[in-house]
């Protein structure tokens, strides 16, 4: 029984003839039509087209999807006639094909692919031309192949690689910003705690150095009302009656009221 990857490997072996008949291509000389195995790639294209129309607001959406489903059914029948088994059209998609081995031993059954797995550039040679829901095909060619190779094509339906990397950079900046704020706040708290501990130690040290400690001449704390007591004569000089305040603060009365 044939698996999807078996079908893909067979199709890759014939992929150099999928553009035939075309007199401009040397390999198409004498070829009157493309091999039926090429239906795999046509079916994968239809699956991408179906996905795009599925999420569009175009008034012709229903009509277009109906036609696409008919075309998908034709390709599925073609593959069934070749391999004698009915493959689910949902299994024949670019992102699933990417995971298939071209050749289990050499990695290049068709002779034109050098990688063990089908990479993004390989799929493009087979007809893969994505248009994402977000970003479309914007800046697809702006990214080097080394970068594109690291991004699975499964994301292409939703967000193109250039936009994805842009969003990842923004996300990374946000994460680094949050990390910076957390570290800064933590360091500030530690610094304040350290200063507080130093003030306590300094206070204890100063108190221990008091020559009159534990004697009848031990220093007493400053009067908490000292500032108010100093301000009262100032207000009295301006003509205010401060008798009640003098009484509350334990100051001697003055006949100024």
Swiss-Prot record:
It is found in: Host membrane; Virion. It is a multi-pass membrane protein. Keywords: Host membrane, Late protein, Membrane, Transmembrane, Transmembrane helix, Virion. One of its GO terms (cellular component) is host cell membrane. Induction: Expressed in the late phase of the viral replicative cycle. The chain crosses the membrane at residues 123-143, 163-183. The keyword Membrane applies. Belongs to the asfivirus C257R family. This is Transmembrane protein C257L. It comes from African swine fever virus (isolate Tick/Malawi/Lil 20-1/1983).
């Amino acid at each position: 029984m044939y698996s999807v990857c078996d079908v893909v490997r067979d199709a890759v072996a014939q992929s150099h003839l999928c553009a035939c008949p075309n007199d401009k291509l040397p390999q198409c000389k004498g070829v009157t039509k493309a091999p039926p195995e090429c239906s795999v790639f046509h079916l994968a294209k239809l699956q991408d087209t179906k996905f795009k129309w599925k999420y569009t607001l175009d008034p012709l959406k229903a009509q277009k999807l109906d036609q696409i489903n008919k075309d998908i059914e034709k390709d599925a029948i073609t593959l069934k006639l070749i391999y004698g088994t009915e493959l689910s059209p949902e299994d024949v998609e670019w992102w699933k094909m990417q995971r298939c081995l071209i050749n289990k031993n050499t990695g290049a059954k068709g002779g034109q692919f050098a990688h063990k797995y089908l990479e993004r550039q390989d799929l493009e040679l087979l007809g893969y031309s994505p248009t994402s829901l977000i970003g479309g095909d914007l800046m697809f060619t702006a990214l080097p192949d080394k970068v594109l190779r690291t991004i699975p094509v499964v994301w292409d339906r939703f967000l193109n690689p250039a936009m994805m990397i842009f969003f990842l950079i923004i996300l990374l900046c946000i994460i680094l910003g949050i990390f910076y704020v957390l570290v800064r706040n933590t360091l500030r708290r530690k610094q304040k705690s350290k200063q507080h501990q130093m003030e306590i130690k300094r206070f204890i040290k100063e108190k221990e150095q008091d020559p009159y400690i534990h004697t009848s001449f031990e220093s007493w704390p400053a009067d908490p009302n000292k500032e108010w007591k100093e301000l009262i004569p100032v207000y009295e000089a301006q003509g205010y009656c401060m008798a009640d305040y003098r009484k509350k603060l334990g100051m001697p009365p003055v006949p100024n009221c």
